[in-house]
Amino acid sequence: QVVFDKIEECFDDQKKSNKKEFALLSMDIDFFKSINDTYGHPGGDEVLKAVANTLRDACGENIVGRVGGEEFIAIIESKKDKTLEEYCESIRKSVIDLSIPFQDNNINITISGGVIKSSEVKDQEEFVNIADERLYKAKEGGRNQFIYS
């Protein structure tokens, strides 16, 4: 809920003061069901923790949160002099670089995401819905990627 409250706050601020554009990333761990099926819920939990920590580190001062299951959302207000595409690519690579130790294995994963800029929409509901639609396009298009349109 904190993430959705922050989205509302960002839209309100943008309307009041012509605040700079921000973006929403809707992200999902690829093939998470297979991870749970292979390693059980304890293995899945380790993956979720590792991804949450990695996203938190990769997103820095930006807001990131888990919104259910294996889905995460990030609100990107600061990109540290990177383009949005470069920023998302660095997130994707940081997840790929994970090697999550579990029992006698190392679990490797990828992440897919849908991206939208606040300038593309008029309200927060449309903002979230379009990001989710783009996430599904990323999944259908082969996974391990971010989709921007």
Please annotate each region the language model reported:
Residues 58-63, 80, 120-123:
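Short glycine/proline-enriched coil/turn segments at helix->beta-strand junctions
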Residues 63-66, 107:
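A short pre-motif secondary-structure segment
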Residues 24-26, 148:
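Core hydrophobic beta-sheet residues of small sensory/regulatory alpha/beta domains
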Residues 41, 85, 103, 116-149:
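Catalytic-core segments of nucleotide cyclases and related cyclic-nucleotide turnover enzymes
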Residues 37, 75-79, 96, 118-119:
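Residue-level recognition of strand-loop junctions within catalytic nucleotide-signaling folds
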Residues 1-23, 30-57, 65-69, 73-74, ...:
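Conserved long alpha-helical elements within nucleotide-processing catalytic cores of c-di-GMP signaling
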